[in-house]
């Protein structure tokens, strides 16, 4: 579903940061200021968000992977929920340095987590002493929190979707280093540099975060559905061709 200007207004997407904290590189996206708060120009934000959704839709149709990144308190739950709904990996606890640039190390941790989960399934924890079981539980909980959202990510993602580029500077830098496209919400206090698909908007409001994440997840699901429909149509076309020439 397409996001509307009214939805953006209701979610407070237009509220930027205090004027004294602004980044001049965001000037083209600022409408003005009110009560020392910058107001973001939604006439710029809406088409830019639509462009980002279009890109995401195409990527998903081609079976691309989009990593959702949002570790701030107000975005944590929404990021996990919407990424799971779209069948995509996510990071919502803390970005571990090297998650993309040192993927080999991450793979080792993922294997450890999967082995531990398999041990739980097999009932192996029941054979452990109380102390061993406690240490095991602590380790698996820590791994699930830090990398549980990326355990099924087979490799470096095709793109990353980030809420708050300043807070996730390391993630953006790693993506830039690897040539991974960045789709990101950029507030008035940060620079849009290094972001391929800029979404100028409020990155602190939980309502605004939900709007962005839902919009990206919807685009992914639409892209996948379109790809499936195209395959079905192609198969039908082949069947009709066979019947005509039978």
Curated annotation (Swiss-Prot):
Q: What is this protein called?
A: Small ribosomal subunit protein uS2
**Transmembrane segment boundaries:** none
Is the keyword Ribosomal protein assigned to this protein?
yes
Look up the coiled coil feature and give its residue ranges: none
Keyword field contains Ribonucleoprotein: yes
Keywords attached to this Swiss-Prot or TrEMBL record, sorted alphabetically, are: Ribonucleoprotein, Ribosomal protein
Q: Name one GO cellular component term.
A: cytosolic small ribosomal subunit
């Amino acid at each position: 579903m397409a996001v509307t200007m009214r939805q953006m207004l209701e979610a407070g997407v237009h509220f930027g940061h205090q004027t004294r904290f602004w980044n001049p590189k965001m000037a083209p996206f600022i409408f003005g200021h009110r009560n020392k708060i910058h107001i973001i120009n939604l006439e710029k934000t809406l088409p830019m968000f639509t462009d980002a959704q279009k890109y995401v839709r195409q990527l998903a149709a081609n079976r691309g992977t989009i990593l959702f990144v949002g570790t701030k308190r107000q975005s944590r739950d929404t990021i996990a929920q919407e990424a799971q709904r779209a069948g995509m990996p996510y990071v919502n606890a803390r970005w571990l340095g090297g998650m993309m640039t040192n993927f080999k190390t991450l793979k080792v941790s993922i294997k450890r987590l999967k082995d531990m989960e398999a041990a739980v399934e097999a009932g192996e924890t029941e054979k452990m002493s109380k102390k061993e079981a406690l240490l095991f539980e602590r380790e698996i909980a820590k791994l699930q929190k830090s990398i549980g959202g990326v355990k099924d990510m087979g490799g470096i993602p095709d793109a990353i979707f980030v809420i708050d580029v300043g807070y996730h500077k390391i993630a953006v830098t790693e993506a830039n280093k690897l040539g991974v496209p960045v789709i990101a919400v950029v507030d008035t206090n940060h620079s849009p540099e290094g972001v391929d698909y800029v979404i100028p908007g409020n990155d602190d409001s939980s309502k605004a975060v939900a709007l962005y994440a839902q919009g990206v997840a919807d685009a992914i699901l639409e892209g996948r559905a379109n790809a499936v429909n195209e395959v079905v149509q192609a198969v039908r076309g082949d069947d009709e061709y066979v019947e005509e020439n039978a």
